[in-house]
Amino acid sequence: MADIRELWDDVARSVAFLSRIPVPDRYFHGYDGGLGRAVRAFPLAAILITLPAAAIAFILGALHASSLFSAFLVVAVQAMVTGALHEDGLGDTADGFGGGRDRESALEIMKDSRIGTYGAVALILSFGLRVSALAAFLPLLTPTGGGIALLATAALSRAAMVWHWSRLPPARRGGVAASAGIPEPGATSVALGSGVLLALVLFFLAGIPTVAVWLSFAAFGLAVPGFTRIASRKLGGHTGDTIGATQQLTEVAVLGALALAI
């Protein structure tokens, strides 16, 4: 029972970290703010965080609403629930990578709250690609299947965050990611294993064709290490922004794969 209670504490803390969903104070009594162990719950927390968007997809699918309108609303709800946390990371990362002449200038740009050209373009592409991918495949699934596919994608994208986080050292001291700690090896394994397993089961329940499932996992397997190598070359480590960007890029890759193969 103690292990289950600790896992649920980690789920609650992960939900608080990854979203704007209110979490009761009792989960934070005596908590030091570290996420080294709590990251194991990221995939489970992702499913809870994505339930509102999945419900919207189900309702609009059952009402036979326009696929483009449904896709826009689903992405909008996701951004509202998370407070656009991951989108902010993608925008800052794009500005830093695109405008930074070297490591130091890239990190300095990423600290600037103002959005630049590279960040704006990255966000337009992220929203556009996710909306177009959802509009392409949601009408081909049942309303229930569409909602479940969103949950599967969410679990994979948050597992990707943990992998990126664990593979690189902090690029700077005092950042959000550095203060949250480094994922414990066991927690990283649990996050990756549970993320992949949950996604596999949920894709099956959603009625996703086998070829689409494997293509989505291939996209996951290419996007996450690929971006991590770029971050290592550009910054020599991770930041909170690159962790958020990992989530966005993984979601785009997986949704794009589903749109191509379903």
From Swiss-Prot:
Query: Pfam family of this protein, just one?
Result: CobS
Biological pathway:
Cofactor biosynthesis; adenosylcobalamin biosynthesis; adenosylcobalamin from cob(II)yrinate a,c-diamide: step 7/7
Give the record's GO CC terms.
Answer: plasma membrane
Tell me the membrane topology, using the record's own terms.
Multi-pass membrane protein
EC number(s) in its UniProt entry?
2.7.8.26
GO biological process terms, semicolon-separated: cobalamin biosynthetic process
Put simply, this protein is called Adenosylcobinamide-GDP ribazoletransferase
Taxonomic lineage of the native organism: Bacteria, Pseudomonadati, Pseudomonadota, Alphaproteobacteria, Hyphomicrobiales
